[in-house]
């Protein structure tokens, strides 16, 4: 998957979980309910935590050809994006958070191309 496709996929997913009313409410509900219900914890992991991380790890593994490095690269890439969900929820200027997301991806993928 090319860098542009990773950026496009990531932004679409971020907007899905933040700007679509049902998905945003579902994400917030999963965040709370993961501590009360094992099924909700599993959904939270699949949709927002380990699921996206594993997906990105597989992409980076194919690009890098190194499974060990792919895991760390996926953590480095997805960690800030995961944090941006919370920042988005509390932000008055939501467009600024989208800009932060785009800047993170541009910087990260540019650094990856250099190394």
Where are these regions (language model features)?
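Alpha-helix C-capping/helix-to-loop hinge sites
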Residues: 12-17, 37, 63, 84, ...
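Short amphipathic alpha-helical segments, especially helix-boundary/capping motifs
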Residues: 2-8, 30-35, 81-83
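Hydrophobic alpha-helical connector segments
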Residues: 1-23, 70-77
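Hydrophobic/aromatic-rich alpha-helical bundle segments in the mid-to-C-terminal region
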Residues: 42, 50, 60-112
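Short, polar/charged, Gly/Pro-enriched helix-capping and turn/loop motifs at alpha-helix termini
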Residues: 20-23, 91, 115
């Amino acid at each position: 998957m090319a860098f542009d496709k990773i950026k496009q996929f990531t932004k679409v997913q971020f907007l899905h979980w933040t700007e679509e009313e049902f998905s945003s409410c579902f994400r917030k509900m999963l965040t709370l309910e993961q501590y009360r219900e094992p099924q909700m914890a599993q959904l939270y992991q699949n949709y927002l935590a380990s699921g996206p991380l594993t997906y990105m790890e597989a992409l980076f593994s194919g690009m890098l050809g190194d499974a060990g490095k792919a895991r760390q690269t996926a953590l480095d890439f997805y960690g800030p994006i995961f944090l941006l969900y919370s920042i988005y929820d509390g932000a008055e200027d939501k467009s600024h958070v989208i800009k932060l997301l785009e800047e993170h991806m541009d910087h990260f993928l540019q650094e990856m191309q250099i190394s």
